Structure formats: structure tokens, C-alpha cells
From Swiss-Prot:
Protein name, entry field: Proline--tRNA ligase
Protein's cellular compartments: Cytoplasm
One cellular component term from this protein's GO annotations in UniProt: cytosol
Catalytic activity, as annotated: tRNA(Pro) + L-proline + ATP = L-prolyl-tRNA(Pro) + AMP + diphosphate
Length: 572
């Protein structure tokens, strides 16, 4: 490709509304342009990267035995009503009517469509297992699209769905897809972790997320320093260690009129924060117990996903409001505690090991100090309620936990029979009777993969693609002052034709621009290998080579350039 025949839309300045690095660089590199909130046009440089990511995904999915299909973006509402998600999904589901007043949605996902397709096409257990995938546009009406294509309303996703007669068959395909995903992200050159995850609105049982580690990520990824254990912070088990110490002081009631938060209590009374607890009031699952107290250590955070799995707690978790709390307990939020509490309480494992701690007295403006379980208040039910913190023991008993930010780029689920039962997707079993199919689903956010690669791999000059396979071009030819030097132009043209004939994805910068501008543009869009042709070096029989990823620069004999270049390209 010649730049003179290409839409080369780089920007010198960073747009003000771009918050994260990937958004900034995708705009500056001329990969995307905004059209409306959460909607983007993909320009030639961007679409080249996108198609190359799709190619890697497609190749690995095919190797894993999946079969490609293509389903409509527009989906009839009846399928969503049949699955039960028409009323469950929420405002992210964009609904509309056609001219015949029939309800449709723009698909945020395709479980309903694929289940309908397979129940029509597959009738016997002999046709299973079956794993179908597509690479297709999705639409989710995000309330606050942000971070460019990282969280946009329209995006491209690879979604696969498998169908089985047994749980064992599903597990086998799930294991294959786990490996396929690992292969995909390794080929793309991404530093990632596969972590245990919550199934969320998709539903099902087992689930893993594939998280690209990046400081701009929205998720906390937890992993062991000494083992393969990794989990989303929502699911990571918090292990409490040690034993509860004997009391050293008598419980006392203290006036604390200006201490309505843990931070204020600690500051005003010079208390160690790990000797305080906070009491959070949530809605109960049972109408006979409308409120439940959750008690965690003062410096810990409540894990809502864990908490809502307790049978006493409403799912989804919902905090009680101040009026409800005051009416039932008689005190405001800043004065709540375990002593003389008139609603059921659940305490975190770490809290169960505490002694001589401070908590609200359930009287406005008062706290109890030196509280001890058993002696001063009966031990409530103990449950894992908190987020893990760095340094906690790994749940598998090996090493301690580290926490990093991650960008979710893939998610695999064992759906079980959630959709197939609701939609009566059956096949004839070996015994001749109808058998409800067991399902799995497997998603990769293709557009998000592009952004996450940039988040993880960039410098102050621009993008550094982690793999040659996804760079918009593999080689850039930069002839300096070509339009003033016949020798430079001739050699550049010959090299361009030769590389093209070898199947190398090459961009030839034939613009009438200063060398500095040409270098800056090629570094900005992240071309891995740059060949710089200058008249003086050419006279000496040498060509300059620059590697974007390593920063390596070297002079190569003109006669050896092609062989050296092919070696660096891995004989591509």
C-alpha cells in the first residue's frame, strides 16, 4: 500500500475528550472517529487491525472444532420473551417496533437466536456435540459509554455456543475453549490471566474471564504469587488466619457525636483501623426478616457478589435506606454495630477473629469500645463477605495474593440448561425420549482486544503492537527525500515490489513530507519494522533498519537486506 493512495488520518494533538491511552492513540493514529456517543467509524488503519485480530480468532476457533455461522443483529422480541430475558435484561437492551408494530431488539448477545436455530436444525443426539460461532456486531445501550471502543454501545464480538447431551460433554468442550482462548491471546502477544468469574446476567454455573492486565482496566484481578490460582476479585475467597485473642479491657460506651464514619472515628480517637468494624444494612431475602446486618472490618470492602449469595440476603443485593434503618434500629448509619442489634447479623471471617474492637452502639452519637465476641455479644453467623486484599493467603494454600487491574477481553460460561429448558430445545436421546440440550457459551470482545493491546503496549511515540500478526502493516518503507533523489526512489520502488511479491504486508511512504513527519507517523501507528532509505547510506551500500518493539537500530548491507528482513519477520 502506498500512503499516497491511502487514507492516512493521523493527528498531532490528543483530543481533549479521550481519557485512556487506547482511546487517545486510536484517534491520533487514525484508527477510529466518533460518530455519536459510543458509536465509532473504523478508518482503514483501524479496520486492518480489526480484521487481523478476527483472523487469529477465526483460525484458532476453527482449530478447536468450532463452526462459523452468521446470525442477524435484529432479533424478534418473542425469543427474548420465551427465554424470560425480555423483562430481566434492563435498559441496555435496545427495543423497537417495525412498521407492522412487531417488537424487535438490537442484539446485545445471541443466546436466544442460537438456541432457536439449533432446536430447528438439530433433532438427534447423534448430531451433538456441536459448537457454532460468529463474529458479529452487538449493541448494548450503555448508560455512559466511555474509554473509546473499550466501552462503546456498538462493538464487534466473537460469540460461540455449544450444545451437548451431557454435562461431561460440555466440560470437554469448555476445556477445549479454555485452551483455544489461551492460544488466541498468546498469539496476540497479550499479558493475560484466565480467572474464575461470576456468571452475571448470562447465567449458568462455571465461568472464566480472560483479563488483559492494564492499569486502566475496570476489573480487579487476583492471582497467587506461587501458583496458577487466579480469580476476579468478586469471586476470590478471603482466608482469615490466626486466632481470636482474649479480651484485655472492659467494654465501654463512648460519646462520639462527630464520628459518623470509620475514618472520623479512627482519627478522633486514635484507633487502629483494623480494630474497628463497620455495619452495613441490606435488604433481606425473607419478608419476615426485611433487614440484615453485614459486619466487616473497618479497612475492608464489602463484596456484594459474595454477600448476595447468602440465603438471608436479597439477590441482587440492595442497601436499606436511612429511613428504614432508623425506623427499625433507632440509630443512623454512622452509629450502627453488633451490640444489642435487633436484626439478624452476618459477620465476615476476619471479624470473627477480632477482639477489643470498636463498633457503633445503635444509639446516635455513641460507640462501644473494647467489644469482644461471646463476652459482650453473641457470635453471629460467620460468612465470607469481603474483598481480598494484597498479601492475603491464596485460597489454594500456595503463596499470597497480588491484585492488578484487568480489562475483560473474553468470557466463557457453562450455561447448563438455562436457555434450552426455557425454549424447549430438545433432541431425541439414545432412549428415544426428548432430551434437553446442555449449553456453553464463549465470547471475545474483538474491538476491545484492539484497545487492550494498545493499553498494554505503547510508549510516548505511539502504539507498539505486541504481535506482528495484528499490526496494520508489517513493514514500512521510509525513503528520505525520495522526490529529490532518483537513486532513493528507484531502490524504494524495487524493494516495495519485491516485498509485495513475497506476500509481506508493506506500506510505502511516498508522500512529499519531511522525514521527521514520516518517522513520527509510522511510529504512531506502530509499524513493527521500518526500513529507512537515505541517499548517503545508499551510496555506502547500506540501509537503516528500525524495530518498533525493541527500539533496535542497525545498518544492513543492501545485498543482505531481504534475507535479514525475512529472518526478522519470521519468514512471513
Amino acid at each position: 500500500m502506498r500512503t499516497s493512495q491511502y487514507l492516512f488520518s493521523t493527528l498531532k494533538e490528543t483530543p481533549n475528550d479521550a481519557q485512556v491511552v487506547s482511546h487517545q492513540l486510536m484517534l491520533r493514529a487514525g484508527m477510529i472517529r466518533p460518530m455519536a456517543s459510543g458509536l465509532y467509524n473504523w478508518l482503514p488503519t483501524g479496520i486492518r487491525v480489526l480484521k487481523k485480530v478476527e483472523k487469529v480468532v477465526r483460525e484458532e476457533m476453527n482449530k478447536g472444532g468450532a463452526i462459523e455461522v452468521l446470525m442477524p443483529v435484529v432479533q424478534p422480541a418473542e425469543l427474548w420473551e420465551e427465554s424470560g430475558r425480555w423483562d430481566q435484561y434492563g435498559p441496555e437492551l435496545l427495543r423497537f417496533e417495525d412498521r407492522g408494530n412487531r417488537n424487535f431488539v438490537l442484539g446485545p448477545t445471541h443466546e436466544e437466536v442460537i438456541t432457536d436455530l439449533v432446536r430447528r436444525e438439530v433433532s438427534s443426539y447423534k448430531q451433538l456435540p456441536l459448537n457454532l460461532y460468529q463474529i458479529q456486531t452487538k449493541f448494548r445501550d450503555e448508560v455512559r459509554p466511555r474509554f473509546g471502543v473499550m466501552r462503546s454501545r456498538e462493538f464487534i464480538m466473537k460469540d460461540a455456543y455449544s450444545f451437548h447431551t451431557t454435562q461431561e460433554s460440555l466440560q470437554a468442550t469448555y476445556d477445549v475453549m479454555y485452551q483455544v482462548y489461551s492460544n488466541i491471546f498468546r498469539r496476540l502477544g497479550l499479558d493475560f490471566r484466565a480467572v474464575q468469574a461470576d456468571t452475571g446476567s448470562i447465567g449458568g454455573s462455571a465461568s472464566h474471564e480472560f483479563q488483559v492486565l492494564a492499569s486502566s482496566g475496570e476489573d480487579d484481578v487476583v492471582f497467587s504469587t506461587e501458583s496458577d490460582f487466579a480469580a476476579n476479585i468478586e469471586l476470590a475467597e478471603a482466608i482469615a488466619i490466626g486466632e481470636r485473642q482474649a479480651p484485655t479491657a472492659e467494654m465501654c460506651l463512648v460519646d462520639t457525636p462527630n464520628a459518623k464514619t470509620i475514618a472520623e472515628l479512627v482519627e478522633q480517637f486514635n484507633l487502629p483501623i483494623e480494630k474497628t468494624v463497620k455495619t452495613l444494612i441490606v435488604k433481606g431475602a425473607d419478608e419476615n426478616q426485611p433487614l440484615v446486618a453485614l459486619i466487616i472490618r473497618g479497612d475492608h470492602e464489602l463484596n456484594e457478589i459474595k454477600a448476595q449469595k447468602h440465603p438471608l440476603v436479597a439477590d441482587p443485593l440492595e442497601f436499606a435506606d436511612e429511613t428504614e434503618i432508623k425506623a427499625k434500629i433507632g440509630a443512623g448509619v454512622g452509629s450502627l454495630g453488633a451490640v444489642n442489634l435487633n436484626i439478624p447479623a452476618i459477620i465476615d471471617r476476619t471479624v470473627a477473629l477480632m477482639s477489643d474492637f470498636s463498633c457503633g452502639a445503635n444509639i446516635d452519637g455513641k460507640h462501644y469500645f473494647n467489644v469482644n465476641w461471646v463476652r459482650d455479644v453473641a457470635m453471629p453467623e460467620v460468612f465470607d463477605l469481603r474483598n481480598v486484599v494484597e498479601g492475603d493467603p491464596s485460597p489454594d494454600g500456595k503463596g499470597t495474593l497480588q491484585i492488578k487491574r484487568g480489562i475483560e477481553v473474553g468470557h466463557i460460561f457453562q450455561l447448563g440448561k438455562k436457555y434450552s429448558e426455557a425454549m424447549k430445545a430438545t433432541v431425541q436421546g439414545e432412549d428415544g425420549k426428548p432430551l434437553v440440550m446442555t449449553m456453553g457459551c464463549y465470547g471475545i470482545g474483538v474491538t476491545r482486544v484492539v484497545a487492550s493491546a494498545i493499553e498494554q503496549h505503547h510508549d510516548d511515540r505511539g502504539i507498539i503492537w505486541p504481535s506482528d500478526e495484528i499490526a496494520p502493516f508489517t513493514v514500512a518503507i521510509v525513503p528520505m527525500n525520495m522526490h529529490k533523489s532518483e537513486a532513493v526512489q528507484k531502490y524504494a520502488e524495487e524493494l516495495y515490489r519485491t516485498l509485495q511479491s513475497q506476500g509481506v504486508d508493506v506500506i510505502f511512504d511516498d508522500r512529499k513530507e519531511r522525514p521527521g513527519v514520516m518517522f513520527a507517523d509510522m511510529e504512531l501507528i506502530g509499524i513493527p519494522h521500518m526500513v529507512v532509505i537515505g541517499e548517503k547510506n545508499l551510496d555506502n551500500g547500506e540501509i537503516e533498519y528500525k524495530n518498533r518493539r525493541t527500539g533496535e537500530k542497525e545498518m544492513i548491507s543492501k545485498d543482505k537486506l531481504l534475507s535479514v528482513l525475512n529472518e526478522k519477520l519470521g519468514n512471513l
